[in-house]
Amino acid sequence: MDRVNHVSNLYFIPEQAALAKWLVKNSCGDKAFFCNSGAEANEAAIKLSRKYAKTKLNIDYPVILTALESFHGRTVTTITATGQPKYQKDFGPLTPGFEYFEYNNIVSLQAAVEKIKAAKDQGHGLAAILIEPLQGEGGVKAGEVEFFKYVRQICDETGALWVSDEVQTGMGRTGKMWGYQNLEGIEPDAFTSAKVHSNL
């Protein structure tokens, strides 16, 4: 071996820079942030959403909405984001600031948004909707276009971010490069991806 291919992200890594350019060219994103796993990518997206809500939307208590039967990782915060009690059992207290709705159910999402609005006087506000474009753990449920149009509408109206969790759906696993590309041109504000990049 003549050179080290990867070291800490503290240092410039030419291959990582090339991957960042490729990701931007082949997605709706205009920047890339690298970390070490899918759970860490979702943790970073949660941190990004909270910081954005506090600094740009002036929300004191940011709330992130996620779907029931979702899967977002195995850290304490990402199991909280994961809408499945079986992954949360015995790991409490869980990270505050999450509420849940039924996947592909506009009425359920509306109710979750209204619950956050009702707590506005306590400083609560919608920071993000973190959602998979296709649920894997939830029984392989494809996202419905009309539902995701509503997700986009809610985020546009409130200023919240739509974060697409592409850890299980990205890099061609749904027939398109990214899962959100199956939604007839509706695009998220940010998306996460992970292990599939080792296939490049």
What are these regions (language model features)?
Residues 1-200:
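Conserved N-terminal phosphate-binding loop of PLP-dependent enzymes in the Aspartate aminotransferase
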